[in-house]
């Protein structure tokens, strides 16, 4: 049990990541610039290419928040392990919450389906993607 206790701060930051991501999406959707953008599009349908921009925005926001949480974990807890278990513990709350709330959507026949799938992918694997890139960069710097 003591082995898993050292990953509790990562789980706590993962819960904070889930709260931050849902809060930021709620703010952007209700009073932000995306609301104004989507409101100004005439004949908005599932085949509108504006959904590709929305998908890029949502995925970028999720990856930015994931990177912020990983870097804050490194700064706040320098003595705790920074490994794949940490990344999984940090990813788990957001990934499970998004899968529970939105479900799995792989309808890639229109732009709306592509946007949902890309957002789901970045929410379910964002921390793991950023952590993998950090590990790869660390290995390259160690070899040089």
Which residues does each PLM region occupy?
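Hydrophobic transmembrane helix segments
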Residues: 15-65
């Amino acid at each position: 049990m003591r082995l898993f206790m050292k990953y509790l701060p990562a789980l706590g930051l993962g819960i904070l990541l889930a709260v931050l991501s849902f809060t930021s999406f709620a703010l952007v959707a209700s009073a932000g610039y995306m609301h104004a953008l989507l409101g100004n599009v005439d004949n908005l349908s599932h085949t509108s290419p504006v959904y590709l921009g929305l998908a890029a925005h949502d995925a970028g926001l999720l990856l930015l928040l994931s990177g912020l949480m990983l870097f804050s974990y490194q700064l706040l807890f320098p003595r705790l392990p920074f490994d794949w278990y940490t990344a999984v513990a940090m990813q788990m709350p957001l990934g499970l919450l998004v899968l529970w709330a939105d479900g799995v959507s792989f309808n890639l026949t229109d732009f709306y389906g592509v946007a949902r799938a890309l957002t789901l992918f970045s929410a379910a694997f964002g921390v793991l993607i950023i952590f993998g890139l950090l590990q790869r960069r660390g290995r390259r710097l160690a070899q040089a």
